[in-house]
Amino acid sequence: MAKRDLDKSASRFLNALWRISAGLEQQRQRILDRAANAPRLLPDSQFPVIDLTGDPGNDLDYYIYELARLQDIGKAIIKVFGQPQELVDAQARFEAGIPNLRVIRNPLTHPNDNDELDEVAWFSSAVKLKPGGSVEELVDPRYEQHEVAIAYHLALATYLRARISVCDRRSSTQAD
C-alpha cells in the first residue's frame, strides 16, 4: 500500500482553503455592498429598514456553500493528519459559532418538495421566522459568524503551513 505524501496533502488543502477563503470574502463583500446601497425604508426611524425586495439572495447562498466547504475540508484535514487536538478544538469552536449551518445549507443544496425552507427569509443573513415575530439566526456573514469562519480557516492554514515547513526543513537538512 502506498504511503500518503502528507506534504502534498497539505499543499492541496492549502490551495483549496485559499479558494474557500476568497469565496467567503467575495460573497460577504457583495452582501455588505448590496445592503449599503439598498433603498432605505423609514429612514428617519430608530431602526431604518433596507429594501432588498427583488434580490434573489444568491450571494448569501454562495456564502453558505463556502461555509459548508470550509466545514467539510476541516473534517478532511483533521482526518488526514490524525486528529490534531488544536484542529479538533478549532472545529468545535466553528460548529458552536455557526450551529445552524447544515440546517440551511443542506436544503439549499438538495432542494426537494418539503417545508425545510418555508420559514426561512433571506436578508443580509438567513433567518428562520418564528411565531410571534421572532427570528432564529441561521447564517449571518456580517459579524461574529464570519469571524468564527475566518478563525477556523486561519487555524487550518496555520497548521498546514507549519506541516509543510517541517517537511521542507527536514528535506533540506537531509540534503546537507
Functional labels for PLM-detected ranges:
Residues 1-97, 123-176:
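Amphipathic alpha-helical interface segments
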